Every structure is written in C-alpha cells, then in structure tokens.
C-alpha cells in the first residue's frame, strides 16, 4: 500500500511539474478577425474611458517605461463578449478566466518598453495575450516573443 501511495504522489508531482512548465506556442496572425463595425464599437466604447496607462497593478504611471492610454471594456457587453468568445476558440482557458477587454491607444511617440505580462506575487498571471489591431495603417511598433526568438 505504501508503494502504491508513493507512486500516486510521484505521479501527481510529475503531472504538476508538466502542467506548470511554460508551454510556448508559435504566435499566430488572423487577418480580418474583427469587422469594421466591431472595431467602431470598441473605439466608441473606449473613447471616453481612456486614461494614461499604468505600469503595474498599483496604478503607477512611469512614462519612461510606457507612454500610452488604456481603457477597460466590460466583457459582458454583447459585442465584446462575442469577440472574446472568438478569441477563446484558439485557447484552452474558459471565459471566466478572462480579464476585461483592454484597449490601448498609442499616439505618435508612444511606446511600451519590453516587458512580460506578469506581476510579482500575483495569482492572476496572464497565460495568453490576444492582440487585436484596430487600425491597418501605422508606423513602428512591434511585438517580440523572446522565448521563441520571434
């Protein structure tokens, strides 16, 4: 019996380690993911709520690290929910694990220095990021995936 229990504990530890090791997927690009009406809806909803973006979950503003504006859209809005549901088809997490939809506006000269979407001692780490570009034409800007050398 002892040997059986030890085997179960070992199996549990192996499964836990496998589950917690980061698994990096190749970035994917989906052209025309949003309709023009959906883009307009997001822009209109966010327009009045845009605030200077913070750098940490403590609402600290440091424009040497990040210069942009952010608004958070209610994920229960029917159009926002539909967009998020379409994003979730490509992920292995349920809707209840999602944050509100974050809208970020970068004006000319805006930036966000290299960072990870993670916070020290925070239980709510982001496991996935789905980036939706609302404008086709822009200059500069890039998203880098250092663990994938991309």
Task: Please report, for each region that a protein language model flagged, where it lies by residue.
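Fe(II)/2-oxoglutarate oxygenase catalytic core
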Residues: 2-150
């Amino acid at each position: 019996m002892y040997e059986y229990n030890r085997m179960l504990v070992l199996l549990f530890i192996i499964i836990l380690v496998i589950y917690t090791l980061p698994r990096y997927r190749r970035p994917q690009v989906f052209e025309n993911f949003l309709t023009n009406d959906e883009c307009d809806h997001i822009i209109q909803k966010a327009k009045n709520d845009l605030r200077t973006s913070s750098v940490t979950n403590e609402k600290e503003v440091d424009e040497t690290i990040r210069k942009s504006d952010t608004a958070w859209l209610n994920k229960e809005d029917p159009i926002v929910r539909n967009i998020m549901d379409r994003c979730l088809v490509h992920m292995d997490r349920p809707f209840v694990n999602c944050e509100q939809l974050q809208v970020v506006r970068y004006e000319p000269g805006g930036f966000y220095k290299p960072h990870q979407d993670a916070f020290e001692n925070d239980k709510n780490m982001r496991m996935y990021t789905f980036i939706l570009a609302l404008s086709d034409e822009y200059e500069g800007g890039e998203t880098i995936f250092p663990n994938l050398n991309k």
